[in-house]
Structure formats: C-alpha cells, structure tokens
Amino acid sequence: MICYFLVVTINFLKEKTTICHYFVNIFSLFLFLFVFVFVFIFVYFFYVILFYRFCSLFTYFPANSIWYYLSIINIFFPLCFFLYENFTGRNRRKCSLFCLTLIKITYTSPNHGFMVTGKEKFEKLRD
C-alpha cells in the first residue's frame, strides 16, 4: 500500500496532473481497500471454517499464530493489487511488477510454507 501511494505521488509530481486526478487515484485506492477487506473477511471465514483441514497442509505455522494469518494476507494482498492495477490500467508497469515480485517471493521462498506438501511438512515436524 505504501508503494502504491509513492507511485501515485511520483506520477502526480512527474506528469504535473491536476490535484483532482491525484485525489481520484487515492479515493479509488481506499474504495478498493474497502472492497478488499470485505472480500478478504468473507474468503477468510470460508477458508478457516470449511477448508481448514485441507489448507493447513500447506503452511508450517500453527493456526493460532500471527504468522499463519500474515501468510494468508501475503498471498491475497499482492494478488488483489495486481488485479486492480490491470483492470483499471493505473500505473500498470510499476505496481504490477512490484506485486508480481511479492507473489513470486511468497510462492518460492524456501522459508515459506506454501510450496510444501503435507508429507514434507510431516517429515519436517517429525525431525
């Protein structure tokens, strides 16, 4: 989110657009975040209640730890920003690359649990 504010501000200063255009971008960001929070709570409810047993195979963290919740946000937040940037066409090149980089780090980091199968998790816990 901070990156988005910086990119919008830099584009505002660089392109010398009107102040109205700047606030429209910021307002659209807050509107998007409101929708994102609503959708995230809805998805999170079903994620925990309905798919907890299946999805817990893909994370190292216990379900009651803060890292478990942060790992879920780490996937949804950059992905939603990437979709938002591509659908609206705002700052497409800069923010989309940033968001894709976050998603790539999330999915490929060796210390992160999302690329680990249930069998490997069980073997790691056993050791």
From Swiss-Prot:
Native source organism of the sequence: Saccharomyces cerevisiae (strain ATCC 204508 / S288c)
The keyword Kinase is annotated on this UniProt entry: no
Name of the protein this chain belongs to: Stationary phase protein 3
Top-level division of the source organism's lineage: Eukaryota
Compartment annotation: Membrane
Chain positions carrying an annotated carbohydrate: N86
Keywords, alphabetical: Glycoprotein, Membrane, Transmembrane, Transmembrane helix
Record's bilayer topology term: Multi-pass membrane protein
Biological role stated in the UniProt entry: Required for survival during stationary phase.
Residue intervals passing through the bilayer: 29-49, 63-83
Cellular component annotations (GO), alphabetically ordered: endoplasmic reticulum; membrane
Oxidoreductase listed as a keyword: no
